[in-house]
Amino acid sequence: MSDKAVLSCRNLGKSYDEGPESVQVLSGLNLELRAGERVAIVGSSGSGKSTLLNLLGGLDRPTQGSVWLAGEELSALGERARGLLRNRELGFVYQFHHLLPEFTAIENVCMPLLIGRTPIPEARERAEALLKRVGLGHRLNHKPAELSGGERQRVAIARALVNRPGLVMLDEPTGNLDHHTAQGIQELMQELSSASRTAFLVVTHDLNLARQMDRVLKLDDGHLVAI
């Protein structure tokens, strides 16, 4: 993969109506993320970091501006096409995991592959390999309720990586992890950004993690500022 932009936004803004008032959460944001680049976004609670991730990932629509993922303008796509593009090009790690409770760890990780019609044996092989890489080779057949918070987070990270997307977005990825496991996740991001040119966009309060990224941006008063 070349160092082209895997994600970009121009003049991005988001506002919400609260009664007769309109509250501007984000305003005039511009961002470009290239293949293999790792970018951290920091900011105080309530600054709009998760809102920004949802806009960049096509989970919400901006009030102003546009987002391009893998060269496709998200607002120009219908819901189905947008969903297929996200599944193919984007991995997303939510702060609270969003694992399917009735499925095992390996079944959860297989899900993006099965949606993309990967044969079941290949899907299971790739899912198992990733779960082993995040230290869960012994927990393949456990359901989310049988896993700790940190283990569920690692399953979510494996699920985000299994489709080999060009971009992975992570919302507080190390919040429930001990130092050793968090360092392992950071090393995995470093390895994938170098070897596979996977780009990572990380929202975090963990300044140690942020400092290990290629760039750090602060979301302040609705604007992104390089720090």
From Swiss-Prot:
Record flagged with keyword Glycosyltransferase: no
GO cellular component: plasma membrane
InterPro entries reported for this sequence: AAA+_ATPase, ABC_transporter-like_ATP-bd, ABC_transporter-like_CS, ABC_transpr_LolD-like, LolD_lipo_ATP-bd, MacB-like_ATP-bd, P-loop_NTPase
Pfam families: ABC_tran
Residue positions binding ATP: 43-50
Subunit structure, interactors included: The complex is composed of two ATP-binding proteins (LolD) and two transmembrane proteins (LolC and LolE).
PANTHER family named among the record's database cross-references: IMPORT ATP-BINDING PROTEIN, LIPOPROTEIN-RELEASING SYSTEM ATP-BINDING PROTEIN LOLD
UniProt protein name: Lipoprotein-releasing system ATP-binding protein LolD
